[in-house]
């Protein structure tokens, strides 16, 4: 029996909302006296507590360390001779940072370092001419200029990503369609501004809508951010076009794979996906799994089944053969589609949420509606992850049979 869980289970709260502005603790307010200083602190901290700011800083530092260490470790694997490993990695980290700047900004950074090292040197010429070199002010100004240039680039990129994110939201449904005998809910949380995950629920043709035959899709493009988002957009367009021709599911997946293979950069840009057709009149669901995390069917009695029939991910082999399969949904059943970002989410100890915890969460699902079930599952993930920075796109689609 469906019920409103809003008072019992919080909804799926994005990372940024989970660190929402709050009033600083009294100890902080006592230390920051005066209206202007207090207002300044509120402005730069957005009202977040010191422990939240520290968690955010450590998450940023950990992500940056991992980003730069990728180059450092790769370089160290190639060149192991000579200096101690610490020195080699420190050198590689330095050059990894420097070479990510434009040539002009590299010159500014090196000049600032030279002036910083040169500051404090004492000089004498004869008995009358003596003094100290002090370029601290010039060094600070150069570093501030470099920071301003980098921030300008970041703000511009962020604005472009926000526009891309807005466009991407047009490609996925804003709300689930109404389906006789079933309740549907979905949600997606990108790691970055744009995502490589794709979900959909639509009637491919007018006759399908009249018959109530619904297409359900979840997919995950290899890679992240802009490249994955662009490939996701082409996948969505080609899927809708082919599905609109009324092709059977087995033929649809073959044609979609051929298209994906022709635009996969020799198999480097592949896509995992699950496509399903649901007929409310018979409660029959036909599906095909193209190398994706298998959707999990939880029966009303608590038993679980994995939907694994299918074939290779899209875009790897243009001649791949796919197998379709069918299941029958019964009253009280729940079908959960999800991407690998769910099971690969990790906590502050770098421990993955994993398939076992995910299965346990699905087995523990109360007899609620699709939206409440979705919130229940995602809360399990959020409780495990805490405030650890998200490492991949997370998408989930839930179908509850009435």
What is each model feature region?
Residues 2-103, 371-383:
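Non-catalytic regulatory/interaction regions at protein termini and inter-domain linkers
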């Amino acid at each position: 029996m469906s019920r409103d869980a809003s008072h019992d289970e919080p909804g799926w709260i994005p990372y940024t909302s989970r660190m929402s502005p709050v009033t600083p603790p009294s100890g902080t307010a006592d230390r920051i006296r005066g209206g202007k200083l207090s207002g300044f602190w509120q402005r730069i901290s957005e009202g977040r507590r010191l422990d939240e700011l520290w968690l955010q800083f450590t998450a940023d530092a950990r992500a940056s360390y991992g980003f730069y260490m990728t180059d450092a470790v790769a370089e160290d694997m190639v060149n192991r001779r000579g200096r101690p490993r610490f020195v080699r990695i420190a050198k590689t980290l330095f050059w990894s940072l420097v070479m990510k700047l434009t040539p002009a900004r590299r010159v500014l950074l090196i000049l600032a370092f030279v002036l910083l090292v040169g500051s404090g040197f004492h000089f004498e010429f004869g008995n009358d001419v003596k003094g100290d070199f002090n370029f601290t002010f010039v060094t600070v100004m150069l570093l501030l200029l470099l920071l301003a240039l980098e921030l300008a680039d970041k703000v511009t990129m962020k604005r472009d990503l926000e526009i891309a994110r807005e466009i991407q939201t047009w490609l996925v449904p804003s709300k689930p369609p109404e389906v006789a005998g079933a309740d549907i809910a979905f949600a997606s949380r990108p790691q970055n501004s744009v995502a490589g995950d794709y979900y959909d629920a639509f009637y491919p043709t007018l006759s399908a809508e009249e018959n109530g035959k619904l297409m359900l899709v979840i997919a995950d493009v290899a890679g992240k951010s802009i490249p994955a988002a662009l490939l996701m957009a082409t996948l969505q367009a080609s899927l809708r076009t082919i599905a609109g021709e009324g092709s059977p599911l087995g033929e649809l997946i073959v044609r979609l794979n051929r298209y994906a293979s022709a635009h996969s950069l020799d198999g480097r840009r592949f896509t995992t996906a699950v496509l399903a057709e649901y007929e409310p009149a018979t409660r029959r669901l036909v599906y095909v799994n193209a190398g994706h995390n298998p959707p999990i069917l939880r029966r009303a009695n608590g038993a679980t089944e994995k939907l694994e029939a299918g074939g290779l991910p899209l875009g790897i082999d243009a001649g791949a053969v796919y197998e379709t399969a069918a299941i029958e949904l019964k009253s009280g059943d729940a079908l959960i589609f999800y991407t690998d970002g769910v099971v690969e989410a990790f906590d502050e100890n770098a421990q993955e949420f994993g398939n076992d915890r995910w299965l346990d969460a699905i087995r523990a699902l109360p007899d609620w509606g699709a939206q409440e079930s979705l919130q229940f599952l995602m809360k399990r993930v959020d409780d495990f992850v805490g405030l650890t920075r998200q490492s991949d796109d997370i998408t989930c689609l839930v179908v509850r049979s009435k």
